[in-house]
């Protein structure tokens, strides 16, 4: 079972990726983790990636595809894998197809921008423990204080409204075209494309995924 997850930051992909990995026993392949692992292992591709990154440049699509191909031959990918954060663009999706990396399911998590802003901007964190609260959906007992320690809660830099809106604009410009790309692929019988309503409770979304994936 080979799966691609699509959706804006804050659409709930991370939570559902965890559910899919545990239920179906397939690994999540994150391009960032893969690059770091290749560099650390000192493989041929890792050396190339390190040179590019050390020069402050972006790693090419060709190199990332080569890394994905190498990664999915490993034993833990025998029953499939989950791609999150890749492909991000049409050229990357085309390159994957040309490299013979076929995908069974493309799952799009659909959440309106305003709800995403609401979800992310309302997050409050207790940095020492990693506990996460939300001013509206999961408030602490005392406003601005951690339940267990009474210490102050903070807002992550990435969770500020301006940053969130900027990331959403980038997502719509770069990644949203993949939605029509994979819809066409599905119409041609090359994959199954499903749009998931990500505004519902986590358990409801997980239940729908279990029905889709079988």
From Swiss-Prot:
Q: What is its main location?
A: cytoplasm
Known EC number(s)?
Answer: 2.7.4.3
Its UniProt pathway annotation is: Purine metabolism; AMP biosynthesis via salvage pathway; AMP from ADP: step 1/1
Gene Ontology process terms (BP): AMP salvage
UniProt keyword annotations, A-Z = ATP-binding, Cytoplasm, Kinase, Nucleotide biosynthesis, Nucleotide-binding, Transferase
InterPro entries recorded for this chain?
Adenyl_kin_sub, Adenylat/UMP-CMP_kin, Adenylat_kinase_CS, Adenylate_kinase_lid-dom, P-loop_NTPase
Q: Which residues bind AMP?
A: 31, 36, 57-59, 85-88, 92, 156, 167
Span list, region Disordered: 139-160
Q: Where does ATP bind?
A: 10-15, 123, 132-133, 200
Catalysis performed (reactions)? AMP + ATP = 2 ADP
Q: GO CC: one term?
A: cytoplasm
Q: Spell out the Basic and acidic residues composition-biased ranges.
A: 142-160
Spans annotated as LID: 122-159
Its function, per the record, reads: Catalyzes the reversible transfer of the terminal phosphate group between ATP and AMP. Plays an important role in cellular energy homeostasis and in adenine nucleotide metabolism.
Q: What is this protein called?
A: Adenylate kinase
In its UniProt entry, the species of origin is given as Serratia proteamaculans (strain 568)
Native organism taxonomy: Bacteria, Pseudomonadati, Pseudomonadota, Gammaproteobacteria, Enterobacterales
